[in-house]
Swiss-Prot record:
It comes from Heliobacterium modesticaldum (strain ATCC 51547 / Ice1). Keywords: DNA damage, DNA repair, Endonuclease, Hydrolase, Metal-binding, Nuclease, Zinc. Endonuclease IV plays a role in DNA repair. It cleaves phosphodiester bonds at apurinic or apyrimidinic (AP) sites, generating a 3'-hydroxyl group and a 5'-terminal sugar phosphate. The gene is nfo. Its cofactor is Zn(2+). Its EC number is 3.1.21.2. GO terms for biological process: base-excision repair. PROSITE patterns: AP_NUCLEASE_F2_3, AP_NUCLEASE_F2_4. This is Probable endonuclease 4. GO terms for molecular function: deoxyribonuclease IV (phage-T4-induced) activity; DNA binding; DNA-(apurinic or apyrimidinic site) endonuclease activity; phosphoric diester hydrolase activity; zinc ion binding. CDD domains: AP2Ec (cd00019).
Amino acid sequence: MYLGAHLSISKGFESAVREALSIGATTFQFFTRNPRGGAAKALDPDDIARSIWLREEHGFGPLVAHAPYTINLAAPKEETWAFAKMTLAADIVRMATAQVPYMVVHPGSHVGQGIEAGIERITQALNEILRPDQGVMVLLEGMSGAGTEVGGRFEELRAIIDGLQVPEVVGVNLDSCHLFGAGYDVKSDFAAVLDAFDRIIGLERLKAMHINDSQQPLGSHKDRHALLGQGLIGSDALAALLNHPALVGLPLNLETPGEIADYRREIAWMRSALKQ
């Protein structure tokens, strides 16, 4: 099991790996570019090579990229949709160059056109972008179901995957806070939640997870992360979650609202909670 947090690569991949090491991490997540928009930073091959060497030296697991929030693959507006496709396609190429195997993508928001229309739009966009030899697996993130978000139910993620021409390059990233907000009771019975995921989507598609507590109650459809043990999921439930055998070998990253010192403390707590 690889434990980490969301870090910045603004100073390069090598710097981010060293920061990860300083907090006891063996993986990390990062944005492919400014999360609110803007041009992508040019990649430095030497920096990438040094970061790969460091990761191998310290037994890192796979890194996880995260697409910017500005892309909406479900957008009904052509200009917005075209921007999302262009950005995602470019970032897949960039992450393949950086040898980052996973990229998390929010499915998108249907903006009032309805879930089915949103799913159709997402699958159409992905079918235009995805290639069997792209070298990066796109991970659809399970959402909390806020507003017009697509992906708040496992069935919605399954419908997207079912519409793909190359489904083998698509997986899923779950988030403990999003699951709780969407109405999946990770506090009382995470095993039952994963059983439902396996039945509807298949555990073989679960490639990464975000570990967050929640400020909002079960089924609130609100995405408000909390520090581990300081939210409504709680330490006991999160410890049980971390010890589920389906998570062994996966990169698990924090997205909690803290500073680097909080990440260091939370990673130490997660490691101490592991029984295997």
